[in-house]
Amino acid sequence: MTCKIIGSGGYLPSKIVSNDELAKFVDTNDEWIRTRTGITQRHIAGDTEYTSHLALKSAEKAIADARVSVNDIDLIITCTTTPDNSFPSVASKLQGYLGLTNIPSFDLQAVCAGFVYGLQVANSLIASGKYKTVLLIGAEKMTSLLDWSDRSTCVLFGDGAGSVILQRSSDDSGLIDSNIFSSGADYEILYTNGGVSMNGISGKIVMQGQKLFRHAIEKMQQSIEDLLHANQFSVSDIDYFIPHQANIRIINKLAELLNIEEHKVVKTVEKHANCSAASIPLALSTLKASGKIKKGDILLFSAIGAGLTWGSALIRW
């Protein structure tokens, strides 16, 4: 028994900040950013536009795409590291926005790997037989965690949300398998220098870029190879590779090491920047909207985030 994606939707805030605009108040330039990251712009949420608002916009699109009633949803999981409040959860607020009552709703925090984590959790809960229609969301307002004087981090991130509707599969489509991992010993590679129990503030992003690059390549490659081997798949079986959209150099290097053909690699980092847990569902929504995916296609997701947390998932469309 496995779950399948029956609908998807993405939302990006209307405000777009190009590299040239960013260079007006940050010591950087368009060439420096593009060469190192592949990013040309990012979407930034307004001061009164919160993660729950982004989540709602993407959820409404996914519900419409799935052609289900909002009342069919019996579980909400929101993957985020930028909640509106310390409590309640974004998922709980979203439940209220959607007019739903008495269904379980909770947030999952695995940063950039959140959507892959959430997919495995949602699949397990659907497999239990207790839930039939799950709304799984990746939503982030990452710009709220940025130190705008630190050009090594502030140029990388954007805001956005992506959602999917999951139901139990009645055929061979759906989640084939997934794996998730963490390594707490490496937490200082990427973290925020604050937190509720630490100092009462959210803090700003601190990153050791070169170390993170090496870990990203190593851990995502191993995760993918293990997943393919465990399920007797080869790289040639993959129709679309949707990696976490953190940095074009990571994406390209990973595709090169795995021998994944260029036309199979989905890249949205140029326009979206790094939207953390939202990046994979946003990229999926973009791919689906292009009309390229067809029934039976094999999709490969893979992500790594702070924690360190990472994992991969294989899906038959």
Swiss-Prot record:
Alphabetical list of Pfam families matching this protein: ACP_syn_III, ACP_syn_III_C
Catalytic residue positions: 112, 244, 274
CDD domains reported for this sequence: KAS_III
EC number: 2.3.1.180
EC class: transferase
GO cellular component terms attached to this protein's record: cytoplasm
Function: Catalyzes the condensation reaction of fatty acid synthesis by the addition to an acyl acceptor of two carbons from malonyl-ACP. Catalyzes the first condensation reaction which initiates fatty acid synthesis and may therefore play a role in governing the total rate of fatty acid production. Possesses both acetoacetyl-ACP synthase and acetyl transacylase activities. Its substrate specificity determines the biosynthesis of branched-chain and/or straight-chain of fatty acids.
Similarity remark: Belongs to the thiolase-like superfamily. FabH family.
Subunit structure: Homodimer.
The name this protein goes by in its record: Beta-ketoacyl-[acyl-carrier-protein] synthase III
Organism (species): Rickettsia felis (strain ATCC VR-1525 / URRWXCal2)
Gene that this sequence comes from: fabH
